[in-house]
UniProtKB/Swiss-Prot annotation:
Region of interest (Disordered), residue spans: 1-28, 196-241
Record protein name field: Solute carrier family 35 member E2A
Bilayer topology term: Multi-pass membrane protein
Location in the cell: Membrane
GO cellular component labels: Golgi apparatus; membrane
This protein's record includes keyword Transmembrane: yes
GO biological process, one term: transmembrane transport
Bias kind Basic and acidic residues: ranges: 198-207, 218-236
Family label: Belongs to the TPT transporter family. SLC35E subfamily.
Length: 266
């Protein structure tokens, strides 16, 4: 490529990707699959004395509706569908195992086979819920890792069906709700992640969906990943979660003419 490349002509091809998504009212029924934007970056580097190399980088971004969170239309729709299919799966499994005398291992194998076939179809066929991205290379020991995860998942399904066959549905689901305790323990032992206790309203509401996560708490922070625990809240002050409580105390002290507590250095 010659060095007389017209950079103004290339800059005209760059779509405007700096626009911020506009806010929505709660329970607004917009696009169920999010907003997508593409950003094209052109960079020119000197590859030699008489030749220039033009590098084109295309970045595709999915904008998450962080302003509404769980109250967005898409989140509510998926949550409703998840509750419905979970309810149907649970009681159909109990019906097949208890009344029809089904075998847990065979039922688990059929479910895993169906999941594998449907997952392959969803990966290969274009679908609105998933867009496959080609890989140039795979991580080391990728097949062995996936095989190990598949075997563990099969064992989890079969053991869950065995327990569902021998005990009541309510007791089986109560025991399953304590699974996050072991998740926290394993993540602490293997990954070194630290999990704490909830400290604000949003995280307490999240715990109501799975009571087992509350029992796994051991400090004032919430049992959520660090990226969510230290992220900026969708409402209120634009401060991390750990700074919101001192900021609230500071405002109360100002309104009551009390000695102001010291705020942590930002």
């Amino acid at each position: 490529m010659s060095s007389s490349v017209k950079t103004p002509a290339l800059e005209e091809l760059v779509p405007g990707s700096e626009e911020k998504p506009k806010g929505r009212s709660p329970l607004s029924w917009g696009s169920l699959f999010g907003h997508r934007s593409e950003k094209i970056v052109f960079a020119k580097s000197d590859g030699g004395t008489d030749e220039n190399v033009l590098t084109v980088t295309i970045t595709e971004t999915t904008v998450i509706e962080s302003d509404l969170g769980v109250w967005s239309s898409r989140a509510l729709l998926y949550l409703t569908l998840w509750f419905f299919f979970s309810f149907c799966t649970l009681f159909l499994n109990k019906y097949i195992l208890s009344l029809l005398g089904g075998e847990p291992s065979m039922l688990g194998a059929v479910q895993m086979l169906s999941t594998t076939v449907i997952g392959c179809v969803k990966t290969l066929v274009p679908c609105c819920l998933y867009q496959h991205k080609a890989r140039l290379s795979y991580p080391p020991n990728f097949l062995m890792t996936m095989l190990f995860v598949g075997l563990m998942r099969f064992a989890t399904v079969v053991l869950g069906l065995v327990s569902l066959k021998n005990v009541a549905v309510s007791f089986a689901e109560t025991v399953k709700s304590s699974a996050p305790i072991f998740t926290v323990i394993m993540s602490r032992m293997i990954l070194g992640e630290y999990t704490g206790r909830p400290s604000d309203r949003e995280e307490r509401e999240e715990l109501q969906l799975q009571p087992g996560r509350g029992a796994a708490a051991s400090d004032r922070r919430s049992p959520v990943p660090p990226s969510e625990r230290h992220g900026v809240r969708p409402h209120g002050e634009n401060l991390p979660g750990d700074f919101q409580v001192p900021q609230a105390l500071h405002r109360v002290a100002l309104s009551m003419a009390l000695p102001c507590p010291m705020l942590p250095a930002s």
